[in-house]
Amino acid sequence: ILKDYGKDVTIPEPEGYDPKEFACACANPVCITPKEPDRVWSKEMMITYGKLPNHKYMINWPIEGNDYYINLIEMSPEERGKALEYAKHYTMCFVYFLQHELGYNTLGLADDEYPTEDKLPFIPYHRESRRIHGLVRFNLNHALNPYTQDEKLYRTCIAVGDYPVDHHHTRYHGYEELPNLYFHPIPSYGLPLGTLIPKDVDGLIVAEKSISVSNIINGTTRLQPVVLQIGQAAGALAALAVKNNQKIDEVSVRDVQNAILDAKGYLLPYLDVPVTDVKFASYQRIGSTGILKGEGKNVDWSNQTWLRADTVLLASELDGLFDVYPASKDEWKKTGTEKLSIAEAVQLVRKIADRKS
């Protein structure tokens, strides 16, 4: 975190500093051959991207900025320590680049953010980790088209996400050979509970970036709003297992979902049914059965899902109901874009209830 001190706080030039490492972090006179020509922002846009209150700035810049690639898992503890020290050094080189090359000499590491000797965070931010083989594996297709997959994972969701599929690979040696994954468009999505539960290990719940997801979809499930919800779901799952004296994989998904709803958490990301809506929990439960299905879309940076909660229900939207109660389909005559009245809806529900009783 940088802070504007209102005076020149330029640090001494770090050992081995090479401005070419960061030349095309933004549009400036030293940027000649950018790795990503279509993504060169102005320096003002770059620095304000992570602007915070109190004259502070988060520096988390993927475009030839302070990203640093390390495969820590393959290293010994001693090697990890050395690699992380160099990663810190690399960050300080980028800070110096901002100060010396771009003229932001009043910005320096905040002295009132982290109580560490070097003013850097306690731990590095990891974008990727080793991942488990879970009871289910969530991938890009489940986010793009949740209702057409063989696995009906949308029925088991315990968290939501709406960030693009964002991969930072240009600091990886050999990134030129990788596919272009830049902000692959997706709708917002729900994350299934089975991604937290290892397939072959009893009594363990996994969270953060080690859940059972594909490499590609990890580009969005890794985001902090998602992993915070994963932690909440993991806590609910563990508590229910202890309370009911059950194994982790024996706990009812619905019990976990109810615990999350009781805490005003989301199962599915409906933009038109906010948590303040009196029907919020009901719509979340209906969506989690698939009786009503959300409509996902991508609009520029915005990844969305809408339930059309304030729109008249169409006959074609009842397919999900007949998946759950197939016998009711024989009694239903409307099709396509024919509208469903309240009286017809009540009659249909009564017939289902009578048959169930």
Language-model regions: role of each:
Residues 1-259:
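Flavin (FAD/FMN)-binding glycine-rich loop and adjacent Rossmann-like elements that form
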Residues 6, 16, 29, 103, ...:
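Short, flexible coil/linker elements and helix-boundary hinge sites characteristic
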Residues 42, 76, 129, 188, ...:
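Generic serine detector
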Residues 1, 97-101, 241-244, 259-266, ...:
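Structured segments of extracytoplasmic/periplasmic soluble domains
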Residues 269-320, 324-355:
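Extracytoplasmic Gram-positive cell-surface binding/anchoring modules and repeats
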Residues 250-282:
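Long, well-structured alpha-helical subdomains associated
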